[in-house]
Amino acid sequence: MTRMQQRTLMVMAGGTGGHVFPGLAVAHLMQAWGWRVVWLGNPNGMEATLVPKHGIPMEYVQFGGLRGKGMKTKLMLPVNLLRACMQSLSVLRRVKPDVVLGMGGYITFPAGMMTALSGTPLVLHEQNSIAGLANKVLAKLAKRVLVAFPKALPHAEWTGNPIREELARTTAPRQRYAARSGPLNVLVVGGSLGASALNEVVPRALAKLAPHERPRIVHQAGAKHIDALRANYEAAGIAAGDGAQLVPFIDDMTSAYANADLVICRSGAMTVAEIAAVGVAAFFVPFPYAVDDHQTTNAAFLADNGAALLVQQRDLSADALADWLRSQTRASLAEMAERSRSLAKPDATEQVAQICATVAGVTPSLSPEGKQQ
C-alpha cells in the first residue's frame, strides 16, 4: 500500500487493560498491513502512557463515568458530554479516519456517537459477556458489531477477543500435559491489583493438603500485596521457595500459562480469552463487584462447557479448595484444557482487522511485506 493509498484506522479505547490490549493487538496487525493507526483515548487513562510506547500517535477526549462520583459530577454530565462530543468531532476532522474501531471505555460513547453522525464507518467490539449501556446504544449505529462472547449483543458477529499472537501459537494441551510428571503445576493470578480472597484462601488450602499432595505453586499477587502474601504463606506453614514461588509480577504470561496444569484466577474478559487460547484448566473466582457481574458470565462460558470450574467468592473456602485440588489429576485437568482450547478464537485479531479493512472498502494485504514479522 503506497503512501498515497494509505488508509487510516482510528482505535478508540481506554480505561482498563481489557479495552486497551485487544485494541493494541488489532492496531499492530493493521500497521503491518500498511495502515496508519491513530489512537483516541483519555489523557488521564492508562492508554495515555501505554499506547505511545507502542509507537502509536494519540488524540485525546476528556470524558469519564458516573459510578462512584458525587452529585456535582452527575449534574455536570450534559456539559461534559457536549464538550466530549465537540472534542471528538474535532479529532475526526483532523485525523480523517477511513474506519473507527471502538473497543470500549467511557470515551467510546461520545466519540462513537460523533463517528456515526459524521458518516465515518464505525466498527464496535464488545469484550465482555454482558454489554454496557454505551455499547448497546452504539451497536444500533455501527456498521459491524463484534463480540467476544456469543449473544453479548443481538445480531452481532462472534469473533472472540483479539489477543497477542504468541498465545495462539502455544503447543497443544495434550502434548504439554503428557510431557509432565510429578506434582501438579498451579498458577495463581491476582493481577496487578492483587486478589485478596485468593491471597488468603490459597495458602490455607495448601496447608490442608499433605506434603505429597501439594502442587507446585506460582502465585502472582501485585506489588502492593506481595508482602501480605508472603505473610499468609508463612502463617500457613508453607515457606516461599518450598514448592511455592511468590512474585509481584509475571513478565511472560504466555509461558506462565503454558507451564501450568491449572490456573486459579479472576475472570476478566482478557483472562478468559487468554486461558482458552493457550488451553489450560481454570478455577475461576469472579470479582464480585464487577459491573453487571460480567465476570461470572465470562467464566460461565468456559465452565458451562466443562472447560473450567466457577466458584463465587462467597463460596470460596480453604476446605473446599483443598478437597477439589485433592480430587484432580493431571489427566482430568488436561481434559478441561482441551475443552478450553476448543472454545478459543485464535484468529480473533486478524478477523477484527479484516472486518475493519472491509468496512473501509479495502481488501487486506496479506503479502509477505504486509504480514507481521
UniProtKB/Swiss-Prot annotation:
List of residues binding UDP-N-acetyl-alpha-D-glucosamine: T16, G17, G18, N128, R164, S192, I250, Q295
Catalysis: reaction(s): di-trans,octa-cis-undecaprenyl diphospho-N-acetyl-alpha-D-muramoyl-L-alanyl-D-glutamyl-meso-2,6-diaminopimeloyl-D-alanyl-D-alanine + UDP-N-acetyl-alpha-D-glucosamine = di-trans,octa-cis-undecaprenyl diphospho-[N-acetyl-alpha-D-glucosaminyl-(1->4)]-N-acetyl-alpha-D-muramoyl-L-alanyl-D-glutamyl-meso-2,6-diaminopimeloyl-D-alanyl-D-alanine + UDP + H(+)
Gene3D superfamilies, sorted: Glycogen Phosphorylase B
Cystine bridges: none
Pathway: Cell wall biogenesis; peptidoglycan biosynthesis
E.C. no: 2.4.1.227
Keyword Amino-acid biosynthesis annotated: no
Membrane topology: Peripheral membrane protein
Entry-linked SUPFAM superfamilies: UDP-Glycosyltransferase/glycogen phosphorylase
Keyword Transcription (UniProt): no
GO molecular function, one term: UDP-N-acetyl-D-glucosamine:N-acetylmuramoyl-L-alanyl-D-glutamyl-meso-2,6-diaminopimelyl-D-alanyl-D-alanine-diphosphoundecaprenol 4-beta-N-acetylglucosaminlytransferase activity
UniProt cross-references to InterPro entries, sorted A to Z: GlcNAc_MurG, Glyco_trans_28_C, GlycoTrans_28_N
Pfam families, A to Z: Glyco_tran_28_C (PF04101), Glyco_transf_28 (PF03033)
One annotated GO biological process: peptidoglycan biosynthetic process
Gene Ontology cellular component annotations, sorted alphabetically: plasma membrane
Keyword terms: Cell cycle, Cell division, Cell inner membrane, Cell membrane, Cell shape, Cell wall biogenesis/degradation, Glycosyltransferase, Membrane, Peptidoglycan synthesis, Transferase
Localization of this protein: Cell inner membrane
UniProt-listed PANTHER family: GLYCOSYLTRANSFERASE (PTHR21015:SF22), UDP-N-ACETYLGLUCOSAMINE--N-ACETYLMURAMYL-(PENTAPEPTIDE) PYROPHOSPHORYL-UNDECAPRENOL N-ACETYLGLUCOSAMINE TRANSFERASE 1 (PTHR21015)
HAMAP family per UniProt: MurG (MF_00033)
Described function: Cell wall formation. Catalyzes the transfer of a GlcNAc subunit on undecaprenyl-pyrophosphoryl-MurNAc-pentapeptide (lipid intermediate I) to form undecaprenyl-pyrophosphoryl-MurNAc-(pentapeptide)GlcNAc (lipid intermediate II).
Entry similarity comment: Belongs to the glycosyltransferase 28 family. MurG subfamily.
Stated name of the protein: UDP-N-acetylglucosamine--N-acetylmuramyl-(pentapeptide) pyrophosphoryl-undecaprenol N-acetylglucosamine transferase
Lineage, broadest ranks: Bacteria, Pseudomonadati, Pseudomonadota, Betaproteobacteria, Burkholderiales
